[in-house]
Amino acid sequence: MADYQFQRVIRFGDTDAAGVVYFAQLLSICHEAYEAAIAALGIELRSFFSDRGSVILPIVHAEIDYQRPTYCGDRLEIELQATALGRDRFRVDYRLSHNHQPVATAQTIHLCLESQTRQRSPLPERLQDWLQITAD
């Protein structure tokens, strides 16, 4: 399976009063990696994440497991893999590490809906292409 690689330095604003990354912030960083992977396909993010398009892709499930804390200044390496789950949804798996040591694993599941009716819809062709690329 082909991975998309993303790097992100932890900023002070990512941390909590204990000086470690706030637990929910790692999911936000995973979403940054997802956005970067979509942008790397040449997809314009403003229209992709807007309800003015023909479809929307809400996250219907998210989970994260933490292996070790991360701190301000740490450089995270994030690998993500996307997998189709039928014709109208897909899963993104994330592996986060720092200095080649596992930090966390996460997963999001996205559902494709018609933006106006909110009914299930097949994944757009460009997204299907991305899923095929990551499956190879």
Curated annotation (Swiss-Prot):
GO MF, any single term: fatty acyl-CoA hydrolase activity
Enzyme kind, highest EC tier: hydrolase
GO biological process per UniProt: phylloquinone biosynthetic process
Enzyme Commission number: 3.1.2.28
InterPro entries: 4-hydroxybenzoyl-CoA_TE (IPR050563), DHNA_CoA_hydrolase (IPR022829), HotDog_dom_sf (IPR029069)
Catalytic activity annotation: 1,4-dihydroxy-2-naphthoyl-CoA + H2O = 1,4-dihydroxy-2-naphthoate + CoA + H(+)
Highest taxon of the lineage: Bacteria
Pathway where this protein functions: Cofactor biosynthesis; phylloquinone biosynthesis; Quinol/quinone metabolism; 1,4-dihydroxy-2-naphthoate biosynthesis; 1,4-dihydroxy-2-naphthoate from chorismate: step 7/7
Active-site residue numbers: 16
Keywords: Hydrolase
Keyword Calcium attributed: no
Function of the protein: Catalyzes the hydrolysis of 1,4-dihydroxy-2-naphthoyl-CoA (DHNA-CoA) to 1,4-dihydroxy-2-naphthoate (DHNA), a reaction involved in phylloquinone (vitamin K1) biosynthesis.
PANTHER family referenced in this protein's UniProt entry, alphabetically: 4-HYDROXYBENZOYL-COA THIOESTERASE FAMILY MEMBER (PTHR31793), ACYL-COA THIOESTER HYDROLASE YBGC (PTHR31793:SF37)
Stated family: Belongs to the 4-hydroxybenzoyl-CoA thioesterase family. DHNA-CoA hydrolase subfamily.
Name by which UniProt lists this protein: 1,4-dihydroxy-2-naphthoyl-CoA hydrolase
